[in-house]
Amino acid sequence: MADGVSVSELVEKIRLDVFYGDELLEQKKVTVSDISRPGLELTNYFKFYPHERIQLFGETEISYAKDSMTKDERTKIYDRMADVDTPAFVVSRGLPIPEELIQAAKNNQVPILTSTLPTSRLLSNMTNFLEDRLAERDSIHGELLEIYGLGVLITGDSGIGKSETALDLIKRGHRLIADDRVDIYQQDEQTLIGEAPRILRHLLEIRGVGIIDVMNLFGASAVKNHTEISVIVHLQNWDKDAHFDRLGNGEQTRHFFELDIPKITIPVRVGRNLGDIIEAATMNFRAKNMGYDATKVFDRNLNELIKDNSQK
């Protein structure tokens, strides 16, 4: 997990306006992705107050404080909410900011940020950004491409031809996300995201050629910054004694964080066109996800044939 996201980065990415605390933005860190909307705190119940979270004020919170609380109550409550660990107060919808909230923020060095977005949309935008930035990360060796809209992670031993295969797939119109090193993180309970380290973004290394800039050579449509990893294609040197799945009914997976990602192992030997094979494997994987499994159709037809022959 990242050490924290500066409030300055949050302001830049979510396009927030700074009402107070420009000088505090770099030093204030957000360490959790959850956003708090004050509820019971406005009634002076602070037993479970999440002081380490961003505090988001929408129309409900601002209206309640204005209509149901006295000036002294607002001063007391807001001052308790402005904890030293609180990253920021955020006010949505361009709502007027209570004077007591401004004073509490100044007294306790808590930035005040504003946005014209509706509260629910602003909450979603901030949560999604923070979940991505604060997620646990890992790096793996391989190529990540988007093939027919699916994120395909190509793995295999060094020198087996992963980069050359990636180049072939790029020339066929597919997109490169990462070459050689892929940074991965779990976005949510069902999604694994892969991206390239910033210094390697859009670059591809080919032995004997060197490093090429894919975006400059093939255009912006040939690259993408990140994608969801849907399937792993593992390239393995051909071994006549090794067992390879011939029917496609053997399910393999590889575990990352809390997720098991489907895996397809492809034997590699001279004369096999890996670009064609990986395209076919990706299309077949997509077809299975849409409910059509060629292996099951073959099994059904075979069983029917055996049944018919046994009745003769």
UniProtKB/Swiss-Prot annotation:
Annotated EC: 2.7.11.-, 2.7.4.-
Molecular function per GO: ATP binding; magnesium ion binding; phosphorelay sensor kinase activity; protein serine/threonine kinase activity; protein serine/threonine/tyrosine kinase activity
Highest rank taxon of the organism: Bacteria
Biological process terms in GO annotation: regulation of carbohydrate metabolic process
CDD domains: HprK_C
Binding annotation for Mg(2+): 163, 205
Region of interest (Important for the catalytic mechanism of both phosphorylation and dephosphorylation), ranges: 204-213
Binding-site residues for ATP, renumbered to this chain: 156-163
Family of this protein: Belongs to the HPrK/P family.
Chain's role: Catalyzes the ATP- as well as the pyrophosphate-dependent phosphorylation of a specific serine residue in HPr, a phosphocarrier protein of the phosphoenolpyruvate-dependent sugar phosphotransferase system (PTS). HprK/P also catalyzes the pyrophosphate-producing, inorganic phosphate-dependent dephosphorylation (phosphorolysis) of seryl-phosphorylated HPr (P-Ser-HPr).
HAMAP family: HPr_kinase (MF_01249)
Protein name per Swiss-Prot or TrEMBL: HPr kinase/phosphorylase
